[in-house]
A protein has these predicted regions:
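N-terminal Rossmann-like dinucleotide-binding module
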Residues: 1-50
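Beta-loop-alpha module in the N-terminal Rossmann-like domain of NAD(P)-dependent dehydrogenases
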Residues: 20, 53-113
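Short, conserved SAM-binding/catalytic segment
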Residues: 45-53, 113-117
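Hydrophobic residues in well-ordered beta-strands that form the structural core
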Residues: 96, 121-123, 228, 255
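Rossmann-fold dehydrogenase core element
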Residues: 109-126, 144-149
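Predominantly a Rossmann-like dinucleotide-binding segment in NAD(P)-dependent oxidoreductases
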Residues: 127-208
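Contiguous beta-strand/loop segments that form the cofactor/metal-binding neighborhood of enzyme cores
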Residues: 183-264
Length: 286
């Protein structure tokens, strides 16, 4: 397969799935062999470069007919475990958006299956390869120990964005959906092991089955502490909705918002979640 294009089946063609599909289309060495989504056959909004690709509404059918080498899974979180296992059983490598599963047991089952089949498993921790976030982490690692890490991402969503969030909350809470990124970042910043985690939450609406707000605290074995907060819904405040701040004995470093030329950043703008205007650094010696 080294001299041939990797045949990719894209499962889930929403915000993330569409982004990945467009990337596969542009990157040499990949060939998209199908798009799979429950409502894909009736869609007329796909970009021109994807519009003529084979479409499937059933994962089993898509795996059998498209015969992919790899599967890109970008569906709602409560399907990740099932679809990963199906892809491995079909002899495919897997890229899956976070979180890997909705339970620890489910995540372990996917990892075990990847090892048993000898296939690659890659999880979409985009911040691990984001240039600005890599620099943010590197700067944090120069601040000494312990670190105090303060992060949040609250989203004042309404209309289509609120519908999307409510659908996500059929699977899990905001603190799990988003928190996996930032706890992973905290682990990289400290290079330490978490020893204690606790959190609280609240359900601020009767339109969801789960809490739509929560915050967690993580303690590490080097004395560092981390805080993360996430809330979704039309009731959420946009005051300090994007905090990415790390403090150590030698100073602090922060990601600052909004973007250049703006006086305000919308909290429900998905693109703003990974954009950075600048890193603000401070030395305790100044």
């Amino acid at each position: 397969m080294q001299n041939e294009a990797v045949r990719v089946l894209v499962v889930g063609v929403g915000n993330m799935g569409l982004s990945h599909a467009l990337a596969y289309d542009k990157i040499e060495g990949f060939e998209i062999v199908g798009l799979c989504s429950r409502s894909i056959r009736g869609r007329n909004d796909l970009p021109a470069e994807l519009a003529s690709l084979p479409r499937y509404e059933n994962v089993d059918e898509a795996l059998a007919e498209s015969r992919p080498d790899a599967v890109s899974i970008n569906t709602y979180p409560n399907t990740h475990e099932e679809f990963c296992l199906k892809a491995f059983d079909a002899g495919c490598h897997v890229f899956v958006e976070k979180p890997l599963a909705t339970t620890v047991e489910g995540a372990q089952a996917v990892v075990d299956k990847a090892r048993a089949t000898g296939k690659k498993l890659v999880i979409g921790y985009i911040l691990r390869v984001h240039p600005a976030w890599k620099e943010f982490i590197a700067r944090a690692q120069t601040l000494g120990k312990p670190l105090v890490m303060r992060m949040n991402l609250n989203q004042q969503s309404r209309g289509p964005a609120w519908n999307w969030h409510r659908n996500l909350m059929e699977s899990l809470t905001p603190i799990v959906d988003c928190g996996v990124h930032y706890v992973d970042v905290m682990c990289q910043m400290t290079g330490a092991q978490p020893v204690r985690v606790h959190g609280v939450g609240a359900q601020l609406t009767d339109q969801t089955k789960v809490q739509n707000y929560g915050h967690l605290h993580v303690e590490f074995d080097d004395g560092s502490v981390g805080w993360y907060e996430a809330g979704w819904g039309p009731m959420m405040s946009e005051v300090a909705f994007f905090v990415k701040d790390v403090v150590g004995p030698k100073g602090c470093v922060s990601i600052v918002m909004p973007q250049e030329g703006q006086d305000h950043a919308a909290s429900d703008d998905i693109d703003s979640h990974t954009k950075t205007n600048a890193l603000l650094c401070h030395s305790s010696e100044i």
